[in-house]
Amino acid sequence: MKATLIALLLFVNTAVFAEVLPSTHFKSVQTFVNEMVQTHGFNKSELQFIFSKIQLTKVDKSMQKKTSTGTRSTEKMSWEKYRSIFVTEGRIDKGVIFWQNNKQALENAESKYGVPSAIIVAILGIETNYGKVQGKYPTLKTLIGKAFGTSSRRNFYQKELESFLLLARENTLPPLAIKGSSAGALGYAQFIPSSYRYYAVDFDNDFRVDLFNNTHDAIGSIANYLAEHNWQKDAEIAKVTELDKTQQSFIQEKISKPIKDAQYWRELGLEIDSTINDDVKLAFIRLHDDQSMQTWLTFWNFYAITRYNHDNHYAMAVYQLSEQLKQTFTSTI
């Protein structure tokens, strides 16, 4: 009886602080709807109907503060653990099959954009396991929740919500039916809505850009994305290297854009591979395993991959998976 009473009191107390309401109840949402009508010519009644189907939780600010200060950040996964998730035999085998089934489209993308087939396939493998896992979360609900909830990136997600609604209108997609990742990323390539609108391409010339079902469009769009971020055709991506203790300060823990060229590093006393020209820009990163660390020399194309996902672990997984895919695919020819 005592436990039941305590549970009831907790429920009542929580209800005071958190109230679930249709998103149209919130002034910030109404302001957004009006802006979409005025700026992009949306039908207000249609937007009101769509937004009314999505509920938001109204949270008391004092409770929000207590909740946020009591949350511990998740420790970053080691490179060894990260790699074990994405660079696997299963993902390699499935990737080779995907490559074989889409060989012509991949060759066309490589010819047009200069991005190797292995890199495109690796990104598709890591993002969605070659389209098998595109996300189960209703995208409109995800974006509204982040755009008008307690997210620290509300402005970013309001822009993505705007792009999502425009994307749905431009491609005759039902906003309430679309599903994606928990961050609002969409389709085979996991483009956020703004990237979908800007970088996605109709690669099979069927007059429709479809990243949900069309592998050719996904292939071309990934290649176009990297090309737009200055992918360098036939250039290197990364090389494992070693630095002595006096050179450790050159290593970046976070993403490092290659700014200094090989000549600069050589003049500082670093032994750079003689096959690398003096004018090639380089950076150094460190990847931590549970018991050790790896130092890598990275080139512009490594940085270009981090424009897809801003994480050194991600870029290195793409690179290493691509190397395994290329080796295995070549052996089947």
Model-derived segments and their meaning:
Residues 1-9, 14-179, 184, 194-333:
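Cell-wall glycan-active module
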